[in-house]
């Protein structure tokens, strides 16, 4: 059962001037596919996801740029990745129980979509975009900064997260003048707990494969396998 938008506004600590933006942020495309008549009044949150993704990326980049003045580009990229990855954004969404407020089709509902990390992360991005359109960038920054700060503080001993994708890209571009490409080759498990399998290639050569609970995690695992193979002279499977 979906909970009320007014309740979510109170949970977020935000009063929207245009509550329709928040309604849109919580409208999954599957709901409109099932309830065609609602398209007269509602849009899906896909466009808001696009905008929210860009806003979150920018604010995360700005924070780590200011926080770590001596860090190089690779380190800054790794810190930013820790803040914007699917698992992190899904965790932010869970703090506010966002999944309980999303409009979903019955099929998505029965498959456990409200707990799916990808859906939670996408919804969080859409809510951020709605807040930006309603109140501007400063309001978004005020809302996001404590979440980002808590995430950075939670990293073990402030250890820099390893971004294997960035490491692999730098190496392959330097050695072969091409950019590694990632391809999803399998998805298994239940809808609410999927496992992705991804391979990474340089041109036609497969460098490695990896598995994970999200495409991002699987890509990182594939990049790590590729680096291990390149350094050890083995197949990256």
From Swiss-Prot:
InterPro entries, alphabetized: dsRBD_dom, RNase_III, RNase_III_dom, RNase_III_sf
GO molecular function: double-stranded RNA binding; metal ion binding; ribonuclease III activity; rRNA binding
Cellular-component GO terms for this entry: cytoplasm
Top-level EC class: hydrolase
Gene3D superfamilies noted in UniProt: 3.30.160.20, Ribonuclease III domain
Active site location: 53, 125
Keyword RNA-binding set for record: yes
UniProt domain RNase III: residue ranges: 5-136
CDD domains for this protein: DSRM_RNAse_III_family, RIBOc
Domain DRBM residue range list: 163-232
Record region (Disordered): 185-237
Record keyword Nucleotide-binding present: no
Location(s), subcellular: Cytoplasm
Biased amino acid composition, Basic and acidic residues: 185-208
Pfam families according to UniProt: dsrm (PF00035), Ribonucleas_3_3 (PF14622)
Residue sites binding Mg(2+) per the record: 49, 122, 125
Documented EC number(s): 3.1.26.3
Swiss-Prot/TrEMBL keywords: Cytoplasm, Endonuclease, Hydrolase, Magnesium, Metal-binding, mRNA processing, Nuclease, RNA-binding, rRNA processing, rRNA-binding, tRNA processing
Record's compositionally biased regions (Low complexity): 216-231
Primary location group: cytoplasm
Reactions catalysed according to its record: Endonucleolytic cleavage to 5'-phosphomonoester
Protein family per UniProt: Belongs to the ribonuclease III family.
Function: Digests double-stranded RNA. Involved in the processing of primary rRNA transcript to yield the immediate precursors to the large and small rRNAs (23S and 16S). Processes some mRNAs, and tRNAs when they are encoded in the rRNA operon. Processes pre-crRNA and tracrRNA of type II CRISPR loci if present in the organism.
Subunit structure: Homodimer.
Full protein name: Ribonuclease 3
Organism: Roseiflexus sp. (strain RS-1)
